[in-house]
Amino acid sequence: MELLKEILQIYMERREWFLELFGQHLKIAGIAIVLAGIMGLLFGIFIAEKEFMAPVILTLANIFYTIPSISLLGILIPFTGIGDKTAIIALTLYGLMPMIRNTYTGICGVSQEIIQAARGMGSTDIQILWRIKLPLALGVILAGVRNMVVMTLSVTAIAAFIGAGG
């Protein structure tokens, strides 16, 4: 119990410093989450519509995801330097896999009967994507967003090893 009191006392004494680090952590993670979310959604839609590209893009996303985070940060340092930029690039690369895979899986899981019915009513491919496929795939896509956000927030702490804030 005494240890807990000492830890709380340190947090209270250095409150501004900890809040500044917390803000830096959220900024780095937030930028990476937005970038990975947008890019992952676009790549997922692309490979769902162009099936022949799915193995290539999914393999690349899986490769980035399997590299240990501290190693990926080390690999990027010679190219992007030390700091927030390197951390954001690495976190974005990590966040792509859950987004790409879940977007692809969600869109490919839409029933072909529903798509054919929409085509029969005169819908264009863009209308089918925006009005049929994406709304029906939204649950799976949001599960990917959740996984990506949790993973990105947790890995962001490791970015401090390469001089990134937080």
Which residues make up each language-model segment?
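Transmembrane alpha-helix signature in integral membrane proteins
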Residues: 18-46
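Loop-to-helix entry region at the N-terminal start of transmembrane alpha-helices
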Residues: 20, 24-28, 77-98, 138
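Transmembrane alpha-helices
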Residues: 30, 93, 126-159
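Cytoplasmic-entry segments and transmembrane alpha-helices of multi-pass inner-membrane transporters
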Residues: 43-76, 91, 101-105, 116
